[in-house]
């Protein structure tokens, strides 16, 4: 397994989307870039990319924010994986998840995309579903009713905005733990006991 990890924060480019639920992946990628002292730069893969090491002599992180809109995230992800010679097992996608309550993080590898078109496009472009996912709960519309697509394109509520910095930090911690200690250890920390 390579000592380089591609972490793809899913979101939509542009100021109209920057503070929406759908862009939580971008927010987590930005937090990780801040932690490793890296800046995002344009890349011919159609993504903003930041690179650095996780700790002194630690694994290399390639952080990506695809600039193709959410549903076309696969092209930039696949291009970067190919450029860095990474298999799907060294790719981590950070995504919003409406089927998980706000302020909750779930981690998994592979499986279905749960109706998330960004993940669907990544799976298709990589030719594999066996990549890690950091699923950041953004919850459903109030009352569980309403337009889910419209909900993820809205900004967080006032109450959610107070908790958002902590959620972003936790999701970034989850990415770091996935890389340093593996999926099982990260799940034990972030999945509440039943």
UniProtKB/Swiss-Prot annotation:
Subcellular location field: Cytoplasm
Protein name: Peptidyl-tRNA hydrolase
Residues at the site labelled Stabilizes the basic form of H active site to accept a proton: 96
Active site per UniProt: 22 (proton acceptor)
Function: Hydrolyzes ribosome-free peptidyl-tRNAs (with 1 or more amino acids incorporated), which drop off the ribosome during protein synthesis, or as a result of ribosome stalling.
Positions of tRNA binding: 17, 69, 71, 117
Annotated transmembrane regions: none
Classification via PROSITE patterns: PEPT_TRNA_HYDROL_1 (PS01195), PEPT_TRNA_HYDROL_2 (PS01196)
Coiled-coil intervals: none
The keyword Cytoplasm is assigned to this record: yes
Cross-referenced Pfam families: Pept_tRNA_hydro
Gene: pth
GO BP of this protein: protein quality control for misfolded or incompletely synthesized proteins; rescue of stalled ribosome
GO MF term (any one): tRNA binding
């Amino acid at each position: 397994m390579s000592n380089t990890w591609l972490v793809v924060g899913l979101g939509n480019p542009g100021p109209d989307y920057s503070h929406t639920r759908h862009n939580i992946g971008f927010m987590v990628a930005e937090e990780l870039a801040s932690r490793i002292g890296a800046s995002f730069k344009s890349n011919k893969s159609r993504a903003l990319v930041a690179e650095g090491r996780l700790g002194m002599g630690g694994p290399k992180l390639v952080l990506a924010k695809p600039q193709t809109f959410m549903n076309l995230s696969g092209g930039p992800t696949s291009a970067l994986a190919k450029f860095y010679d990474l298999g799907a097992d060294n790719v981590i996608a950070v995504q919003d998840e409406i089927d998980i309550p706000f302020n909750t993080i779930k981690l998994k590898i592979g499986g279905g995309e749960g109706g998330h078109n960004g993940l669907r496009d990544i799976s298709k472009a990589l030719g594999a579903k066996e990549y890690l996912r950091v699923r950041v709960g953004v919850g459903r519309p109030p009352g569980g009713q309403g337009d889910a697509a419209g909900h993820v394109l809205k900004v967080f509520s006032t109450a959610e905005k107070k908790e958002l910095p902590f959620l972003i930090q936790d999701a970034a911690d989850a990415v770091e733990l996935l890389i340093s200690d593996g999926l099982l250890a990260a799940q034990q920390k972030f999945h509440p006991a039943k």
